[in-house]
């Protein structure tokens, strides 16, 4: 596969090398360029778990970050000249990749989120395949690869992130064979039979094989990738079982050996634990309970508004528990914080309408004037407010139909130094493999979800403390630093540069 529109990439001259020994390449920068009412611009922290996970790693290594600055650039706004070169923002070196409205529509909203996202999440929604989307995906990936090439010093380590940039490793290797390249996928990698639906399946696998190390959350994803690389590209692959942070698989392609491994991502659990102990956070948590009418129990959901997250499942389960009298309407409330997401994609617009209809129905059926049983907020919550909600709630509901990891579950656990609360967790999250002392449920089994919620609501204090203590032991020991270090250690031990 040619890296972009059939054109061969050119290896950069040494004069074009950057000065960063460590480069993160992701769809978004850790900050967005935002236009103010007076027409001026400012930088604002980007939403999303990827930024939360990677920013501390980048700061410690004094590296550079390549990504989209969050503003569409159609060439008509002269004041966007700030994006012309590297930027130092909050002590981070940023290399913006400028994307037009058409780029966003076809590369991001189209191929990334209407093709890859549903395919990789077990086809909960039917993937759409359009050649013009694919062509734009190739073109934008080439631009990211070129930006990374310009940012990286000779012999640097480049860490490419997630499904939007799966072609970048091969493209970057063609540009800069001196680099050590890692790739990590933050969403599930699908079973072989689903991935084979993809018209451009071989090109995707070839793109990933440009890396020295390809990482997934779980061993199953790594095994799927090895099978596909053998079947589609003809690599000689290892046949043993891939372990967690150990027992790496291998795919041999020509003179190169690509490591394949499982590295479950986590959160900055120490920082969350510290923040949740803060006096102001504790006071805000008490205020939240008061504002909700001092219910006996608070159920909490925190999600992007996405069809994979199972928000409708927990609402349906809560509604039926109320109808059956297993949950009392006068002493239990459900708070759902739903962060807006991909609002221009039709399936997401439909989902929002459906969720808001469900909320209205439940409140109409079981709420009272001034006392709804479901409190629904369709907006992002500031970090401290979110932590206060974690501390205030009695049961955390994490019920995705499919999720690569789900960091919200780990964030909740990290915030419960009081050993209070309970976690109801979908079996179809990556987190379920580690958080075995949660109340694990199958989101496709509504009765099972209802039973899990009821059990969590009615657990004894002793049983709850025992479960939370075990969950916290796991989350505090395996934080985001350990995730990053385990990946980067494995990358450093992968076959070295120059295998291009």
UniProtKB/Swiss-Prot annotation:
A Pfam family the protein falls into: Glyco_transf_20
Protein function: Probably involved in the osmoprotection via the biosynthesis of trehalose and in the production of glycogen and alpha-glucan via the TreS-Pep2 branch involved in the biosynthesis of maltose-1-phosphate (M1P). Catalyzes the transfer of glucose from UDP-glucose (UDP-Glc) to D-glucose 6-phosphate (Glc-6-P) to form trehalose-6-phosphate. Probably also able to use ADP-Glc, CDP-Glc, GDP-Glc and TDP-Glc as glucosyl donors.
Source species of the chain: Mycobacterium bovis (strain BCG / Pasteur 1173P2)
EC assignment: 2.4.1.15, 2.4.1.347
The protein's name: Trehalose-6-phosphate synthase
Binding, D-glucose 6-phosphate: 28, 108, 162, 342
EC category: transferase
Involved in alpha anomer selectivity (site feature) positions: 117, 187
Claim: Electron transport is one of the keywords in the record: no
PANTHER family in UniProt: BCDNA.GH08860, TREHALOSE-6-PHOSPHATE SYNTHASE
Positions bound to UDP-alpha-D-glucose: 48-49, 304, 309, 407-411
Functional pathway: Glycan biosynthesis; trehalose biosynthesis
Example of a GO MF term: alpha,alpha-trehalose-phosphate synthase (UDP-forming) activity
Entry similarity comment: Belongs to the glycosyltransferase 20 family.
Catalytic activity: ADP-alpha-D-glucose + D-glucose 6-phosphate = alpha,alpha-trehalose 6-phosphate + ADP + H(+); CDP-alpha-D-glucose + D-glucose 6-phosphate = alpha,alpha-trehalose 6-phosphate + CDP + H(+); GDP-alpha-D-glucose + D-glucose 6-phosphate = alpha,alpha-trehalose 6-phosphate + GDP + H(+); TDP-alpha-D-glucose + D-glucose 6-phosphate = 5-methyl-UDP + alpha,alpha-trehalose 6-phosphate + H(+)
Domain of life: Bacteria
Subunit structure: Homotetramer.
Keywords of the record: Glycosyltransferase, Transferase
GO terms under cellular component: cytosol
GO BP terms in the entry: trehalose biosynthetic process
């Amino acid at each position: 596969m040619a890296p972009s529109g059939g054109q061969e990439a050119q290896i950069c001259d040494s004069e074009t090398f950057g000065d960063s020994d460590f480069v993160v390449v992701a769809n978004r920068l850790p900050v967005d360029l935002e236009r103010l009412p007076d027409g001026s611009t400012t930088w604002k922290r980007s939403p999303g778990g990827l930024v939360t996970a990677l920013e501390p790693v980048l700061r410690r290594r004094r590296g550079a970050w390549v990504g989209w600055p969050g503003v569409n650039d159609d060439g008509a706004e002269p004041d966007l000249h700030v994006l012309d070169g590297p930027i130092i923002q909050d002590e981070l070196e940023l290399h913006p990749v400028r994307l037009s409205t058409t780029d966003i529509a076809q590369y991001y909203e189209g191929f990334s989120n209407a093709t890859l996202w549903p395919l990789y999440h077990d086809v909960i929604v039917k993937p759409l395949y359009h050649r013009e989307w694919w062509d734009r995906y190739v073109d934008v990936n080439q631009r990211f690869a070129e930006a990374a090439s310009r940012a990286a010093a000779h012999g640097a380590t480049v860490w490419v992130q997630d499904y939007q940039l799966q072609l970048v490793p091969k493209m970057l290797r063609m540009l800069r064979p001196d680099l050590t390249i890692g790739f990590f996928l933050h969403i599930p990698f699908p079973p072989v039979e689903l991935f084979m639906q993809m018209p451009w399946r071989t090109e995707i696998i070839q793109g990933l094989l440009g890396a020295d190390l390809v990482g997934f959350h779980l061993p199953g994803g790594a095994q799927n990738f090895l099978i596909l690389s053998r079947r589609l590209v003809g690599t000689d692959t290892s046949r043993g079982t891939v372990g967690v942070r150990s027992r790496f698989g291998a795919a041999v392609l020509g003179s190169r050996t690509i490591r394949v491994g499982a590295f479950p991502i986590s959160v900055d659990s120490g920082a969350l634990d510290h923040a949740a102990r803060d006096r102001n956070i504790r006071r805000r948590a008490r205020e939240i309970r008061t504002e909700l009418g001092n219910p006996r129990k608070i159920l909490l959901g925190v999600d992007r508004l996405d069809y994979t997250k199972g928000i409708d499942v927990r609402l349906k389960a809560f509604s039926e528990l109320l109808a059956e009298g297993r949950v009392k309407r006068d002493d239990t409330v459900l708070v759902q914080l739903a962060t807006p997401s991909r609002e221009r994609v039709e399936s997401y617009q439909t989902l929002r309408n459906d969720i808001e209809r469900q909320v209205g129905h439940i409140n109409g059926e079981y709420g009272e004037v001034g006392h709804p049983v479901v409190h629904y907020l369709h907006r992002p919550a500031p970090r401290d407010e979110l932590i206060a909600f974690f501390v205030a709630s009695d049961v955390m509901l994490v019920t995705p139909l499919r999720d690569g990891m789900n960091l919200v579950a780990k964030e909740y656990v990290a915030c419960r130094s009081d050993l209070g609360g309970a976690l109801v967790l979908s079996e179809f999250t990556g987190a379920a493999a580690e958080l075995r002392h949660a109340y694990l449920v199958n989101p496709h089994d509504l009765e099972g979800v209802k039973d899990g919620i009821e059990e969590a609501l009615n657990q004894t204090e002793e049983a709850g403390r025992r479960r939370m203590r075990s969950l916290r032991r796991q989350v505090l020991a395996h934080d985001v630093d350990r995730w990053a270090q385990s990946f980067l250690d494995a990358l450093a031990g992968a076959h070295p540069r120059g295998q291009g």
